[in-house]
Amino acid sequence: DSSENLGIINIIPSGNMGSISKHAYQDVTSSGESFTINVPESRSGSITSSFQWLGTSFDPSVELTTPNGQTIQLTFSGSQDDGAGISIWSGLTETQRGNERLDLYIYGPNGILQQGEYELEFTSNSPITEVHGWMRGPWGHWSEGIRFLSPSPSNQYTTCFPGTSDWAIVVAGYQSPDWSAPFYYPYSGQGPRIDGHRTV
């Protein structure tokens, strides 16, 4: 966006995290919905994740359940621990587009992230709100390692780095050998943005 302000035209590819289980989304109601993250093996590193929703009126409550059965209510204000050696950092910020984003980091005892499932339960008294989650892990190939187990990942709405500029021309990977059944490549972002803006 900064270079666009200087008159430079940007044409960039759009990545996709859904087909490799690094992006998932679902509607959250007052009864609560969970995002389940799977860590396939105990290794050094951390879970790095972000969750985003439209607007700033969602006011969620988020509870983390770790593989050892400990639960902790996120405060969105920095560091916490579950009492069993797992450390958590969480923070809630407003984005430039007026949405809210929850950033979450989970660290294991002595830097070793514990194998198993980490469940994040979102609840809110606000109207039904669509919550999106993105994540990355510290090891493995792009399509391996830490991933969402639920909700089911989806290619829709995934417009990822480097295709994240508001003003760039964003290009998808598109296949159409005979023009009878065109499709996006699974590694390509498809959009739209979570606010419905068409970006690809």
Give a label for each model feature.
Residues P138-S150:
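A short "linker-to-beta-strand initiation" element
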Residues E4:
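Anion (oxyanion) recognition and catalysis
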Residues D1, P13-S14, E121-N125:
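Short acidic, glycine-rich surface-loop motifs adjacent to enzyme active sites
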Residues G7, I20-Q114, F122-T123, F148-V200:
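Extracellular S/T/G-rich loop segment that most often corresponds to the catalytic His/Ser-adjacent loop
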Residues I11-G15, V171-A172:
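Active-site neighborhood of phospho(di)ester-bond hydrolases with catalytic His/Asp-centered motifs
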Residues P127-G140:
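Edge beta-strands of jelly-roll/beta-sandwich modules across compartments, strongly enriched
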